[in-house]
Amino acid sequence: MRAWVIKEIGELNPRNFYLSEVEEPVIALNEILIKVFVCGVCHTELDEIEGRAKPSFLPIIPGHQIVGEVVAIGECVNKFQIGDLAGAGWIYSTCGKCAFCKRGLENLCPEFKGTGKDAQGGYAEYFKIREDFAFKLPHGKKPEKLAPLFCAGGIGYRALKLSGLKNGEILGLIGFGASNHLVLKIAKVLYPDSPVFVFARNPNQRLLALSLGADKAFDIEEEPEEYPQALIDTTPVWRPPFYLLKYIKPGGRLVINAIRKEDLDKEFLLNLSYERDLWHEREIKTVANITRQDIEEFLMLVDKAQIEPEFEICPFERAFEALEDLKNQKIKGAKVLKIN
Protein backbone atom coordinates (compact mmCIF):
# COMPACT_ATOMS: atom_id res chain seq x y z
CA MET A 1 0.00 0.00 0.00
CA ARG A 2 1.01 3.65 -0.30
CA ALA A 3 1.89 5.53 2.87
CA TRP A 4 3.75 8.64 3.95
CA VAL A 5 6.70 7.65 6.11
CA ILE A 6 8.89 9.48 8.60
CA LYS A 7 12.31 7.95 8.04
CA GLU A 8 14.44 10.08 10.35
CA ILE A 9 14.26 13.08 12.66
CA GLY A 10 15.20 16.50 11.31
CA GLU A 11 13.88 19.56 9.53
CA LEU A 12 10.90 18.83 7.30
CA ASN A 13 12.35 17.79 3.94
CA PRO A 14 11.74 15.12 1.26
CA ARG A 15 14.59 12.96 2.59
CA ASN A 16 13.03 12.30 5.99
CA PHE A 17 9.32 12.42 5.07
CA TYR A 18 8.14 10.91 1.81
CA LEU A 19 5.52 8.77 0.05
CA SER A 20 6.49 5.10 -0.08
CA GLU A 21 5.23 1.59 -0.76
CA VAL A 22 4.88 -0.40 2.48
CA GLU A 23 3.25 -3.64 3.55
CA GLU A 24 -0.45 -3.59 4.32
CA PRO A 25 -1.23 -4.06 8.05
CA VAL A 26 -2.12 -7.57 9.21
CA ILE A 27 -4.85 -7.63 11.84
CA ALA A 28 -4.80 -9.75 14.98
CA LEU A 29 -7.29 -10.66 17.72
CA ASN A 30 -9.78 -7.85 18.48
CA GLU A 31 -8.43 -5.64 15.67
CA ILE A 32 -10.13 -4.09 12.65
CA LEU A 33 -8.64 -3.04 9.32
CA ILE A 34 -9.78 0.32 8.01
CA LYS A 35 -9.53 1.43 4.40
CA VAL A 36 -8.64 5.06 5.04
CA PHE A 37 -10.80 7.61 3.22
CA VAL A 38 -9.35 10.72 4.87
CA CYS A 39 -6.83 11.71 7.54
CA GLY A 40 -6.61 15.12 9.19
CA VAL A 41 -3.34 17.05 9.21
CA CYS A 42 -2.05 18.09 12.65
CA HIS A 43 0.90 20.10 13.99
CA THR A 44 1.86 16.97 15.94
CA GLU A 45 3.16 15.49 12.68
CA LEU A 46 5.62 18.39 12.44
CA ASP A 47 6.58 17.87 16.09
CA GLU A 48 7.32 14.21 15.33
CA ILE A 49 9.34 14.89 12.18
CA GLU A 50 11.34 17.70 13.77
CA GLY A 51 12.02 15.78 16.97
CA ARG A 52 10.02 17.66 19.59
CA ALA A 53 7.73 14.65 20.02
CA LYS A 54 9.95 11.82 18.84
CA PRO A 55 8.22 8.67 17.54
CA SER A 56 8.83 5.46 19.47
CA PHE A 57 10.33 3.86 16.38
CA LEU A 58 11.36 4.68 12.82
CA PRO A 59 10.33 4.49 10.07
CA ILE A 60 6.75 5.27 11.08
CA ILE A 61 3.53 6.33 9.36
CA PRO A 62 2.14 9.48 11.06
CA GLY A 63 -1.46 10.68 11.23
CA HIS A 64 -4.15 10.34 13.88
CA GLN A 65 -7.43 11.83 12.60
CA ILE A 66 -8.65 8.87 10.61
CA VAL A 67 -11.97 8.05 8.97
CA GLY A 68 -12.60 5.11 6.67
CA GLU A 69 -14.43 1.88 6.00
CA VAL A 70 -13.94 -1.37 7.91
CA VAL A 71 -12.77 -3.93 5.33
CA ALA A 72 -11.63 -6.76 7.62
CA ILE A 73 -12.23 -7.83 11.22
CA GLY A 74 -10.16 -10.03 13.48
CA GLU A 75 -11.35 -12.77 15.78
CA CYS A 76 -13.56 -11.73 18.73
CA VAL A 77 -14.54 -8.40 17.14
CA ASN A 78 -18.13 -7.61 18.15
CA LYS A 79 -18.50 -3.85 17.78
CA PHE A 80 -17.86 -3.59 14.03
CA GLN A 81 -18.92 -5.32 10.84
CA ILE A 82 -17.35 -5.14 7.40
CA GLY A 83 -18.69 -2.06 5.64
CA ASP A 84 -19.06 0.07 8.78
CA LEU A 85 -17.75 3.62 8.80
CA ALA A 86 -15.11 3.96 11.53
CA GLY A 87 -12.88 6.63 12.99
CA ALA A 88 -9.75 6.72 15.13
CA GLY A 89 -7.95 9.47 16.99
CA TRP A 90 -4.74 10.12 18.92
CA ILE A 91 -5.52 7.45 21.52
CA TYR A 92 -4.32 4.16 20.02
CA SER A 93 -4.21 2.09 23.22
CA THR A 94 -3.74 2.18 26.99
CA CYS A 95 -3.12 -0.52 29.59
CA GLY A 96 -6.60 -0.36 31.12
CA LYS A 97 -5.24 -1.49 34.49
CA CYS A 98 -3.27 1.35 36.06
CA ALA A 99 -4.59 3.85 38.61
CA PHE A 100 -5.08 6.49 35.91
CA CYS A 101 -7.07 4.18 33.64
CA LYS A 102 -9.27 3.09 36.55
CA ARG A 103 -9.98 6.74 37.42
CA GLY A 104 -11.08 7.63 33.90
CA LEU A 105 -7.76 9.36 33.17
CA GLU A 106 -6.48 6.96 30.53
CA ASN A 107 -4.85 9.92 28.79
CA LEU A 108 -2.27 9.87 31.60
CA CYS A 109 -1.64 6.10 31.42
CA PRO A 110 2.13 5.40 31.48
CA GLU A 111 1.56 2.93 28.63
CA PHE A 112 -0.48 5.37 26.52
CA LYS A 113 0.23 4.90 22.82
CA GLY A 114 -0.39 7.73 20.38
CA THR A 115 -1.57 6.89 16.88
CA GLY A 116 1.14 7.75 14.36
CA LYS A 117 3.74 8.17 17.10
CA ASP A 118 3.80 4.90 19.04
CA ALA A 119 1.90 2.89 16.42
CA GLN A 120 1.49 3.15 12.66
CA GLY A 121 -0.91 5.95 11.74
CA GLY A 122 -3.33 7.10 9.09
CA TYR A 123 -1.26 8.76 6.36
CA ALA A 124 -1.80 5.48 4.54
CA GLU A 125 -4.29 3.57 2.44
CA TYR A 126 -4.97 1.13 5.29
CA PHE A 127 -4.80 1.32 9.09
CA LYS A 128 -5.39 -1.17 11.88
CA ILE A 129 -6.50 -0.66 15.49
CA ARG A 130 -8.17 -2.56 18.32
CA GLU A 131 -11.93 -2.28 18.03
CA ASP A 132 -12.33 -0.81 21.53
CA PHE A 133 -10.19 2.20 20.53
CA ALA A 134 -12.09 2.83 17.28
CA PHE A 135 -15.35 4.74 16.93
CA LYS A 136 -18.36 3.64 14.93
CA LEU A 137 -19.68 6.46 12.76
CA PRO A 138 -23.03 6.95 11.02
CA HIS A 139 -23.17 6.52 7.26
CA GLY A 140 -24.25 9.58 5.35
CA LYS A 141 -21.71 11.91 6.97
CA LYS A 142 -18.91 13.23 4.78
CA PRO A 143 -15.63 11.70 6.02
CA GLU A 144 -13.71 14.94 5.45
CA LYS A 145 -16.05 16.70 7.89
CA LEU A 146 -15.48 14.02 10.52
CA ALA A 147 -11.69 13.67 10.45
CA PRO A 148 -10.83 16.97 12.24
CA LEU A 149 -13.16 16.02 15.08
CA PHE A 150 -10.86 13.23 16.25
CA CYS A 151 -7.99 15.45 17.42
CA ALA A 152 -8.45 19.15 16.69
CA GLY A 153 -12.02 18.96 17.94
CA GLY A 154 -11.76 16.31 20.63
CA ILE A 155 -8.66 17.71 22.31
CA GLY A 156 -10.03 21.23 21.92
CA TYR A 157 -13.13 20.03 23.76
CA ARG A 158 -10.95 18.59 26.53
CA ALA A 159 -9.10 21.91 26.79
CA LEU A 160 -12.41 23.74 27.13
CA LYS A 161 -13.49 21.40 29.94
CA LEU A 162 -10.16 21.92 31.71
CA SER A 163 -10.55 25.71 31.48
CA GLY A 164 -13.17 25.68 34.24
CA LEU A 165 -15.17 28.31 32.35
CA LYS A 166 -18.67 29.14 33.60
CA ASN A 167 -21.43 30.53 31.43
CA GLY A 168 -21.15 34.29 31.18
CA GLU A 169 -17.38 34.41 31.74
CA ILE A 170 -15.08 35.61 28.96
CA LEU A 171 -13.09 32.96 27.08
CA GLY A 172 -9.92 33.86 25.22
CA LEU A 173 -8.49 31.72 22.41
CA ILE A 174 -4.82 32.13 21.47
CA GLY A 175 -4.21 31.05 17.89
CA PHE A 176 -7.03 30.21 15.51
CA GLY A 177 -6.31 27.08 13.53
CA ALA A 178 -7.79 23.59 13.34
CA SER A 179 -8.49 23.25 17.07
CA ASN A 180 -9.50 26.69 18.32
CA HIS A 181 -11.93 27.36 15.49
CA LEU A 182 -13.84 24.31 16.72
CA VAL A 183 -13.48 25.41 20.35
CA LEU A 184 -15.16 28.68 19.36
CA LYS A 185 -18.11 26.79 17.89
CA ILE A 186 -18.40 24.47 20.90
CA ALA A 187 -18.14 27.34 23.40
CA LYS A 188 -20.99 29.17 21.69
CA VAL A 189 -23.17 26.11 22.30
CA LEU A 190 -22.08 25.19 25.84
CA TYR A 191 -21.65 28.75 27.15
CA PRO A 192 -24.10 30.89 25.15
CA ASP A 193 -23.65 33.94 27.39
CA SER A 194 -19.84 33.86 27.33
CA PRO A 195 -18.08 36.33 25.03
CA VAL A 196 -15.24 34.72 23.08
CA PHE A 197 -12.14 36.76 22.27
CA VAL A 198 -9.60 35.49 19.73
CA PHE A 199 -5.92 36.49 19.80
CA ALA A 200 -4.08 35.76 16.56
CA ARG A 201 -1.10 37.30 14.79
CA ASN A 202 -2.45 36.51 11.33
CA PRO A 203 -5.10 39.08 10.29
CA ASN A 204 -6.81 36.47 8.10
CA GLN A 205 -7.29 34.27 11.15
CA ARG A 206 -8.81 37.21 13.03
CA LEU A 207 -11.23 37.85 10.17
CA LEU A 208 -12.15 34.16 10.06
CA ALA A 209 -12.76 34.18 13.82
CA LEU A 210 -15.14 37.13 13.56
CA SER A 211 -16.97 35.51 10.64
CA LEU A 212 -17.49 32.36 12.75
CA GLY A 213 -18.95 34.22 15.70
CA ALA A 214 -16.07 35.48 17.83
CA ASP A 215 -17.12 38.57 19.75
CA LYS A 216 -13.77 40.31 19.34
CA ALA A 217 -10.44 39.56 17.68
CA PHE A 218 -7.08 40.99 18.71
CA ASP A 219 -3.47 40.81 17.69
CA ILE A 220 -1.38 38.54 19.92
CA GLU A 221 0.04 41.44 21.93
CA GLU A 222 -3.03 43.67 21.95
CA GLU A 223 -4.63 44.38 25.33
CA PRO A 224 -8.36 43.60 25.42
CA GLU A 225 -10.81 46.10 26.93
CA GLU A 226 -12.14 43.35 29.20
CA TYR A 227 -10.04 40.53 30.60
CA PRO A 228 -10.87 36.83 30.08
CA GLN A 229 -11.43 34.34 32.87
CA ALA A 230 -9.77 31.59 30.84
CA LEU A 231 -7.32 31.37 27.94
CA ILE A 232 -6.82 28.35 25.69
CA ASP A 233 -3.51 28.40 23.81
CA THR A 234 -2.88 26.31 20.70
CA THR A 235 0.23 28.07 19.40
CA PRO A 236 3.51 26.13 19.00
CA VAL A 237 5.58 28.87 20.67
CA TRP A 238 6.04 30.38 24.15
CA ARG A 239 5.54 34.11 23.79
CA PRO A 240 1.80 34.41 23.01
CA PRO A 241 0.35 32.60 26.06
CA PHE A 242 2.86 33.95 28.54
CA TYR A 243 2.57 37.50 27.22
CA LEU A 244 -1.21 37.34 27.61
CA LEU A 245 -1.06 35.68 31.03
CA LYS A 246 -1.21 39.06 32.77
CA TYR A 247 -4.62 39.73 31.22
CA ILE A 248 -6.31 36.73 32.86
CA LYS A 249 -8.68 37.71 35.65
CA PRO A 250 -7.76 36.74 39.25
CA GLY A 251 -8.46 33.06 39.83
CA GLY A 252 -8.46 32.43 36.08
CA ARG A 253 -6.69 29.72 34.14
CA LEU A 254 -4.41 29.35 31.13
CA VAL A 255 -4.80 25.99 29.37
CA ILE A 256 -1.99 25.07 26.98
CA ASN A 257 -3.23 22.72 24.27
CA ALA A 258 0.01 21.61 22.60
CA ILE A 259 1.98 18.38 22.68
CA ARG A 260 5.24 20.36 22.63
CA LYS A 261 6.51 23.94 22.35
CA GLU A 262 9.26 25.06 19.99
CA ASP A 263 12.48 26.43 21.50
CA LEU A 264 12.79 29.50 19.26
CA ASP A 265 11.42 31.97 21.81
CA LYS A 266 11.81 29.99 25.02
CA GLU A 267 13.87 32.80 26.56
CA PHE A 268 10.65 34.85 26.80
CA LEU A 269 9.87 32.87 29.96
CA LEU A 270 12.63 34.86 31.68
CA ASN A 271 10.37 37.92 31.37
CA LEU A 272 7.70 36.43 33.61
CA SER A 273 6.88 38.45 36.71
CA TYR A 274 5.39 36.57 39.63
CA GLU A 275 3.41 39.61 40.82
CA ARG A 276 2.17 40.73 37.40
CA ASP A 277 1.62 37.40 35.65
CA LEU A 278 1.06 34.66 38.22
CA TRP A 279 -0.21 36.13 41.46
CA HIS A 280 -3.93 36.33 42.34
CA GLU A 281 -4.29 32.54 42.14
CA ARG A 282 -3.93 32.31 38.39
CA GLU A 283 -3.41 28.74 37.17
CA ILE A 284 -1.57 27.14 34.26
CA LYS A 285 -2.75 23.75 33.06
CA THR A 286 -1.73 21.59 30.12
CA VAL A 287 -3.69 19.17 27.98
CA ALA A 288 -2.04 15.76 27.78
CA ASN A 289 -3.44 13.36 25.20
CA ILE A 290 -7.14 12.49 25.12
CA THR A 291 -9.59 9.91 26.44
CA ARG A 292 -12.14 7.90 24.52
CA GLN A 293 -14.83 9.55 26.62
CA ASP A 294 -13.69 12.98 25.38
CA ILE A 295 -14.10 11.87 21.77
CA GLU A 296 -17.46 10.18 22.39
CA GLU A 297 -18.85 13.22 24.21
CA PHE A 298 -17.57 15.56 21.53
CA LEU A 299 -19.00 13.52 18.66
CA MET A 300 -22.41 13.50 20.38
CA LEU A 301 -22.23 17.25 20.98
CA VAL A 302 -21.23 17.98 17.39
CA ASP A 303 -24.06 15.83 16.05
CA LYS A 304 -26.66 17.41 18.34
CA ALA A 305 -25.53 20.99 17.68
CA GLN A 306 -24.82 20.40 13.97
CA ILE A 307 -21.27 21.75 14.30
CA GLU A 308 -19.02 21.35 11.28
CA PRO A 309 -15.33 22.20 10.90
CA GLU A 310 -13.90 24.65 8.42
CA PHE A 311 -11.51 22.63 6.29
CA GLU A 312 -9.46 22.40 3.13
CA ILE A 313 -9.05 19.13 1.24
CA CYS A 314 -5.58 18.15 0.11
CA PRO A 315 -4.76 15.25 -2.25
CA PHE A 316 -2.93 12.40 -0.54
CA GLU A 317 0.08 12.89 -2.80
CA ARG A 318 0.52 16.44 -1.46
CA ALA A 319 0.86 15.64 2.25
CA PHE A 320 4.34 17.18 2.28
CA GLU A 321 2.93 20.47 0.98
CA ALA A 322 0.13 20.31 3.54
CA LEU A 323 2.66 20.16 6.37
CA GLU A 324 4.66 22.97 4.77
CA ASP A 325 1.50 25.09 4.71
CA LEU A 326 0.86 24.26 8.36
CA LYS A 327 4.42 25.16 9.30
CA ASN A 328 4.08 28.49 7.48
CA GLN A 329 0.58 29.16 8.86
CA LYS A 330 -0.94 29.05 5.38
CA ILE A 331 -4.05 27.24 6.50
CA LYS A 332 -7.70 28.06 7.06
CA GLY A 333 -9.37 25.95 9.72
CA ALA A 334 -8.30 22.33 9.32
CA LYS A 335 -6.52 20.53 6.49
CA VAL A 336 -7.61 17.02 5.48
CA LEU A 337 -5.80 14.49 3.27
CA LYS A 338 -8.10 12.66 0.86
CA ILE A 339 -6.66 9.17 0.48
CA ASN A 340 -9.19 6.68 -0.92
Sequence positions of predicted segments:
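NAD(P)H dinucleotide-binding glycine-rich loop of Rossmann-like/cofactor-binding domains
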Residues: 94-174
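Glycine-rich phosphate-binding loop and adjacent beta-alpha segment
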Residues: 238-308, 339-340
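C-terminal hydrophobic helical "lid"/dimerization subdomain
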Residues: 200, 292-340
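Mid-domain Rossmann-like dinucleotide-binding core that forms the NAD(H)/NADP(H) cofactor-binding site
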Residues: 139-221
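A short acidic, Gly/Pro-enriched loop at the edge of an enzyme's catalytic core
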Residues: 223-231
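Glycine-rich beta-strand-centered segment in the early N-terminal region that forms part
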Residues: 23-39, 52-99, 133, 138-140
